[in-house]
């Protein structure tokens, strides 16, 4: 599969995943329902220090790439803010992966408020794809566990490529952040489907290309989460909803099918079993016979 097609597939996967935090943060529910805290990327014009990537990466002892440079995308740091945080407070996601809460003042420069390093984290039974797997990454959002406890989504991705198409997938381990800068060894949920995107060629003859309304079979899916009071005080149950679209090959867009599956993930459930509770019910961007 060519570079152009691969880039398009990964771009779409990123877009569908980005919908997750926005949907979770604004999901309708009761007044008592907790919400995810999405991070908002800081625009270049709003960054208080243009040299922040080098300085913040040095503070974290991280080997960072240069934002916007070809080949450095997997190692480039990203800077975010969370809604309602005090002025001068930021979150940085660095290779490793690492999550930093940092502060900036014109007189003092950058300081690390908290640092969570996931370079020692290994997701269980990671899926193999084509070629080298991409590095683990942290999705820019915080997910409530109950009380003042939050988790982050550590994403393990893989891809497939072949003539005329390809696909990319991501599973998420939701791992609790410790107040002292550590992280839980056991995730709240393991291998929960997070996003997927797949394209299969559907045209093979000149007649197909000239007359077909759609020359590929397209799939895309993404996760939404809701958080509700659980049976145990101080703990939240999660409601995971998977939404997937399937546009069949050689059919008009009006024939696109839509799937929505929801499962409840009670607090304290075996992490792998929790992930499988959703995975076993969805196509995950694969054709269903």
Which role fits each region the language model picked out?
Residues 1-7:
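N-terminal secretory signal peptides that target proteins for export/translocation
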Residues 11-21:
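Bacterial N-terminal signal peptides
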Residues 27-69, 165-171, 177-289:
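Acidic, small-residue rich beta-repeat scaffolds with periodic aromatic anchors
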Residues 47-102:
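Basic/polar, acidic-poor N-terminal "presequence/leader" segments
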Residues 72-79, 128-142, 209-228:
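Signature of short aromatic-glycine-proline-rich micro-motifs recurring in repeat-based ectodomains
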Residues 79, 88-148, 160:
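Short N-terminal edge-element motif at the start of the domain
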Residues 87-94, 149-161, 234-241:
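Short beta-strand elements that form the blades of beta-propeller/WD-repeat-like
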